[in-house]
A protein has these predicted regions:
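Membrane-interface transmembrane-helix boundary segments in multi-pass integral membrane proteins
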Residues: 61-70, 132-154, 161, 172, ...
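Long, contiguous internal "core" modules enriched in hydrophobic/ aromatic residues
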Residues: 1-153, 166, 248-249
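Alpha-helical transmembrane segments of multi-pass membrane proteins
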Residues: 115, 183-187, 233
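Central hydrophobic cores of alpha-helical transmembrane segments
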Residues: 175-185
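Membrane-helix interface "capping/anchor" motifs
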Residues: 165-176
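Hydrophobic, well-ordered secondary-structure elements that form the walls
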Residues: 117, 161, 191, 240
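C-terminal TM-helix exit segments that contain a strictly Trp-centered aromatic cap at the helix terminus
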Residues: 118-125, 187-197
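Extramembrane terminal tails and long inter-domain/linker segments of multi-pass membrane proteins
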Residues: 1-26, 98-99, 201-212, 221-261
């Protein structure tokens, strides 16, 4: 059917020869080595889009590592959020083991500590710089109308991940899934706090105000989530959720891999 034609086109003449496997593994390693600097460069550039402005709360040199750590932190949480239901629904326990989830949890501990450090440095800069608008914006951020998203950000992104130091929690799938959901919420609040509080409390008091989302804002936000999950579910439905290459490599290394009771 149409799937066979699509897969044949995407295979591009793949026959599984020894030469093709060697080229595949070389390309695989190259792309794996390319990914980390690409992530760092992309999110650093995005952060500098903010840091190059003079908006209080944005003009900070901490933004580059802050954004990189935050991107990895939220990315790990989203991977766990998607991986755990996928593992359960499709019974992929053989390929996605508890060890994989525990290692992801350990990485979340690391990125959570880095993000927490960035929060501390950000508050320190606001107080130490003797910049009155910067300090006023920080106080407004902590105690003003948007204090709830700020404290949710601090709690969910920095303090909740510390629970993963406990091995019993780190190896518990429900606990891990719940913590990942909270981190996703916290990272969304972080983006909200960065953008809204900075623009709501700038230099000119006459421009101060509250951001009240309209139906357009809400529709765009909900539509973004719907768009992502639409393509994710279509991918899971029509393409292998686990790389067949890695499944075959695992089966070659361990004949028991792939067998189900």
């Amino acid at each position: 059917g149409w799937r066979h034609r699509v897969y044949a086109f995407l295979a591009q003449g793949w026959q599984g020869t020894d030469r093709q496997w060697r080229h595949y593994k070389a390309a695989y390693l190259f792309l794996a080595a390319l990914a980390p600097p690409l992530v760092i460069s992309v999110h650093s550039v995005v952060s500098w889009d903010f840091a190059q402005s003079i908006v209080p709360g944005w003009h900070s040199t901490i933004f580059a590592p802050y954004f990189v750590a935050g991107a990895i932190h939220s990315g790990l949480a989203m991977v766990i959020t998607l991986l755990i239901p996928l593992r359960r629904i499709f019974r992929l326990d053989t390929y996605i083991t508890q060890a994989h989830l525990e290692n992801l949890a350990k990485l979340i501990i690391l990125t959570g500590l880095i993000v927490g450090y960035a929060y501390v440095v950000e508050s320190y800069i606001a107080g130490y710089s003797n910049n009155v608008p910067e300090w006023q914006r920080f106080i407004y951020q902590v105690t003003g109308e948007y204090a709830i998203p700020f404290w949710i950000m601090i709690l969910f992104n920095s303090l909740v991940p510390l629970l993963l130091f406990v091995k019993r929690i780190r190896t518990s799938t429900p606990w891990l899934f719940g913590i990942a959901i909270l981190i996703n919420i916290g990272m969304w609040c972080e983006r909200f706090v960065i953008i809204v509080t900075g623009l709501a409390h700038e230099y000119d008091p006459s421009s101060w105000g509250l951001f009240i989302p309209t139906w357009v804002d809400i529709s765009i936000t909900v539509g973004s989530f719907a768009w992502f999950f639409l393509w994710f579910l279509l991918f899971v439905k029509h393409l292998p959720a686990v790389s067949i290459t890695e499944v075959k490599e695992g089966a070659t290394a361990d004949p028991l891999v792939g067998e189900h009771p």
